[in-house]
């Protein structure tokens, strides 16, 4: 393999920087961080790879230990020491703090991501991030709601925080179908204050699987088919306790139809009488919120990555081998150098 090109050489060959940014996401303890640690600093073509790690230092040592406190709060709610209202207020406050580092970095990065150049481009920089802001603003809050630790009203407040997505977002949802292996990985981390909560694990896996379908639906329906979405909404059943149990516990299969239906999306969870008129139609404000969620998701290029039976090394090889199929965006060289500086500063202060 030829020696990796330096940034100065690459910059002299291109009028603008070409950026691939990829978010690795999925349930907790699935192996994302291990993958990220093993990803090389340059691709096989010599393209520099920048890695943004999970902000664990911020979560655990800046003010409150969020990991310990959120698990303790949920345990106390289940023991009857907290009411749903009390646990919801605490969990939502903690979940907002989980989201803060993602949102701050996302805002800085968004201003540097310009128009899409397509796929199979010649990138000058690959940026790989451990989780997208959607994890802390949508996926974990929905899972906490499904497990009974967060109320519907607080969940609504969280999903509003999902930021607008600039062009060129590649979101890879890591999947591990072997629950026994997943539990083993989570338990073996042995992190202080972290507990192996099988109900939460199943809820998260279901939410992330459903997220892929939701993004596919958004890509099809937005922004031109709002009437079609509203018609489908009326046909959804009320999401009650039995449907919540089914959602969490029944195995989900990858949707293979020509078009995802609203029934297969996360929005079906919000078909509640508290949010709707008697005929099932959403109140205006909540309709704006859910349609806004779809509009934010529609710029995301999503893919499932099934790592069942694969070693970390094989996962990394497979992930990097498909890099040329992901979206590329234009960025200025000044922006590219700023991204590098931001990543170094963020990892130094936030990561462990």
From Swiss-Prot:
Substrates-to-products reaction catalysed: thymidine + ATP = dTMP + ADP + H(+)
List of catalytic residues: 54 (proton acceptor)
Entry binding sites for substrate: 95, 191
Source superkingdom: Viruses
Membership in a protein family: Belongs to the herpesviridae thymidine kinase family.
GO BP annotation list: DNA biosynthetic process; TMP biosynthetic process
Subunit and partners: Homodimer.
UniProt entry tagged with the keyword Kinase: yes
Name of the protein described by the UniProt record: Thymidine kinase
Gene that this sequence comes from: TK
Tagged with keyword Ribosomal protein: no
Keywords in alphabetical order: ATP-binding, DNA synthesis, Early protein, Kinase, Nucleotide-binding, Transferase
Annotated source species: Gallid herpesvirus 2 (strain RB-1b)
Functional note: Catalyzes the transfer of the gamma-phospho group of ATP to thymidine to generate dTMP in the salvage pathway of pyrimidine synthesis. The dTMP serves as a substrate for DNA polymerase during viral DNA replication. Allows the virus to be reactivated and to grow in non-proliferative cells lacking a high concentration of phosphorylated nucleic acid precursors.
Record EC number: 2.7.1.21
GO molecular-function terms, A-Z: ATP binding; thymidine kinase activity
Residues that coordinate or bind ATP: 26-33, 185
